Amino acid sequence: MILFIPYLICLVGTSSALKVMTFNIWLSGAEVTNGMEKIAKQIQNVNPDVVALQEVESPDVVTNLTLLLGDNWSGVHHCNSTYPDTGILTKHTIIPGTYVHVDYGMHVKIQLLDTKRQISFWSMHLDYRSYGPYACYNKLVNSEKQIMAGEMPTTCTGRVQNMVQLVTNQNFINQISKSNVVPVIVAGDFNVPSDEDWTEANRAEHGGWAFEWPATKILRDSSGMKDSFRELHPDPLADPGITWSTVNKFEKEWDYTIPEPEDRIDFIFYRGPLRPTSSFPYAGTGPLTPIPHQWGNEWPSDHYAFITEFQDLPVSDDPVDPVKSVDRKYINRHGRDALRVATPQCNAEIIDGSEERQGRSLSLSGEGQHGSEVK
Ligand SMILES: *[C@@H]1O[C@H](CO)[C@@H](O)[C@H](O)[C@H]1NC(C)=O
Ligand SMILES: *[C@@H]1O[C@H](CO)[C@@H](O)[C@H](O)[C@H]1NC(C)=O
Ligand SMILES: *[C@@H]1O[C@H](CO)[C@@H](O)[C@H](O)[C@H]1NC(C)=O
């Protein structure tokens, strides 16, 4: 019996903290002066372990950020080189051959230095069009069907289809089934509020609507993921956690007289044996001067970033509930099309600042192509 005690202490000793940041970098810093430097500086101030990026405008954005962040940082972006949009930065080790993408996001597995732990990490940026809160504040909108038409359009892919594509992705399903050993984190800009936020209690603050926004609901119901912020702060009235917007306070048309609705649209979801200990929106420490006078702001984005700190607990042997099928009401004709992952296969590179200085970058093997993740 006594012999077991040092072993237990040893197990406890392997647990460590994990700080995750999701950061929409607003056209890659183009809307403030020296935007790229400011993005890097804000990441350094937060000092996260992993960052989910959105609005990576071109492939050299991740290269430049890793160069600015310093030696131990590396990154990957979505392999769509026309507009990568999503990317991941970390000061730990990106595991080659683990890149996977969907149309609106991408994933790599990360080995946490100084531990035996790995995480499966997704950065997502769902479609920005037909922004739901605008419908809710439009007095000509009087049925939920009209709002849902924006989330789940029949003529193109919307946020419902984007999320259904993620939760039905075979790699994602495999990751969830192993999340008791390798936690899964889905972070990003969903461009839509949470189904846990627009409740009866705060109807008055939401244009008179309580509404079950579907993207977060699909993620929670189907994959059993939890929203780290809402878990720690369950009352949306007391803790709205607004992330939109830092500087977009009034619409440019009508001479900035019409206010922009404020919402929490950036999220850090997780599944696995780790426990969030703090979670908060973040926009630096300086003043946030609204559009159109934002150019001198130290904070380079029109979103707040979101940060969640996890306590990384020992591996669990508990069985994992598998991913459940998506509620049929979220599948329309265009949704079925989205289930067949449309994006062609492509290669992604791990971009390492120190290697890049010498004019080359580490290439992922063919295993990194879509649909062939090592299980
Ligand atoms: C990245 O850095 C290179 C070299 O300084 C520069 O030419 C390029 O414009 C930068 N790209 C972005 C997106 O800032
Ligand atoms: C970078 O990583 C090396 C090797 O893991 C470590 O010795 C060093 O302290 C790290 N540097 C920084 C700035 O974190
Ligand atoms: C890459 O992204 C652009 C812009 O979103 C899109 O139009 C294009 O279809 C994408 N390319 C591929 C190969 O998916």
Kindly give the residue locations of the regions a language model identified:
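Cleavable N-terminal signal peptides of Sec/SRP-targeted secreted and luminal proteins
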Residues: 1-17
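Active-site regions of metal-assisted phosphoester/phosphodiester hydrolases
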Residues: 16-42, 88-335
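Internal alpha/beta domain cores that form substrate/cofactor-binding pockets in large enzymes
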Residues: 18-31, 61-76
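Proline-aspartate-enriched helix->loop->beta-strand connector
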Residues: 43, 47-53
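A short beta-strand-loop structural module common to alpha/beta enzyme folds
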Residues: 52-55, 229
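Acidic helix-start/capping segments at beta-turn-to-alpha-helix junctions
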Residues: 56-61, 84, 190-193
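A short, structured active-site edge motif that brings together acidic residues
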Residues: 73-87
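Long, low-complexity intrinsically disordered regions of secretory-pathway proteins
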Residues: 329-375
